[in-house]
A protein has these predicted regions:
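Short acidic, low-complexity intrinsically disordered linear motifs used
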Residues: 1-12, 241-250
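N-terminal segments that cap or nucleate solenoid repeat domains
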Residues: 6-43
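Leucine-rich solenoid repeat scaffolds
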Residues: 199-247
Length: 250
């Protein structure tokens, strides 16, 4: 069994960052009180030691964790992708970035109001509760979702592909990237003026909404769209060669 021994007393008072990534450790020692950032990605850990009160960044993806210890009130970034976690602890209000993709999460957790980046993809979530008003990036693909909640007006990235969605809520004006492929969508809501990328392939769409001039890439194959008459779409009529032929996957 590979593990690391406790730090010397002379080091405990000065260490702020530790990187144990891809070291095949089964166990970690007691962590220094001064620690701000811990990276233990890609080991064989089944548990973590008590986390220091001042810890701000925790990266523990790719282990065998089934749970996490209590999180310190100072934590800003948490990445625990691809473990075997089924229940998450309470999150501190300081948390800005949260990644727990590829676990066994069924119940969507309560989120801190200041959260800006959330990746909950590849879990077993069937319902998402209220999202923080500060959220900018949401990755919730490969779950069991049938609907989405009201989206915060700050949201810029939405990846909700590979679910069972039949419709989407109103899209926020800040949205730039919308990936909603491989669902059961029959229509799309009005697209925001600043959207740059739309991937809506493999749904049940029979028409597209008006496509804003800001759009740079559209992928919409695998639907029931009438491609025989692209002039029916104002966007393609306005940019018949520059976009339809070169940047759009039809």
């Amino acid at each position: 069994m590979k593990y690391i021994k406790r730090f010397e007393n002379s080091l405990e008072s000065i260490i702020t960052t530790i990187n144990y990534s891809n070291s095949r450790f089964y166990k970690l020692p007691k962590l220094p009180k001064t620690l701000i950032s811990l990276d233990c990605v890609g080991n064989n850990l089944i548990s973590l030691p008590k986390l220091p009160d001042g810890l701000e960044n925790l990266y523990c993806s790719g282990n065998d964790l089934t749970s996490l210890p209590n999180l310190p009130d100072s934590l800003k970034k948490l990445t625990c992708n691809f473990n075997s976690i089924t229940k998450l602890p309470k999150f501190p209000i300081t948390l800005i970035e949260l990644h727990f993709a590829g676990n066994g999460i069924i119940k969507f957790p309560d989120l801190p109001e200041g959260l800006e980046h959330l990746d909950c993809s590849s879990n077993k979530i069937s319902h998402i509760t209220k999202l923080p008003n500060s959220l900018k990036k949401l990755y919730c693909y490969k779950n069991n979702l049938t609907e989405l909640p009201i989206l915060p007006y700050t949201l810029e990235y939405l990846y909700c592909n590979h679910n069972n969605l039949e419709k989407l809520p109103k899209l926020p004006g800040a949205l730039e990237y919308l990936i909603c492929s491989n669902n059961e969508l029959t229509s799309l809501p009005e697209l925001p003026d600043g959207i740059q990328l739309l991937d809506c392939r493999n749904n049940n769409l029979i028409e597209l909404p008006d496509l804003p001039d800001s759009l740079k890439k559209l992928t919409c194959d695998g639907n029931n769209l009438p491609y025989d008459d692209l002039d029916g779409y104002k966007y393609f009529k306005k940019y018949p060669e520059k976009y339809a032929a070169k940047k759009f996957n039809l």
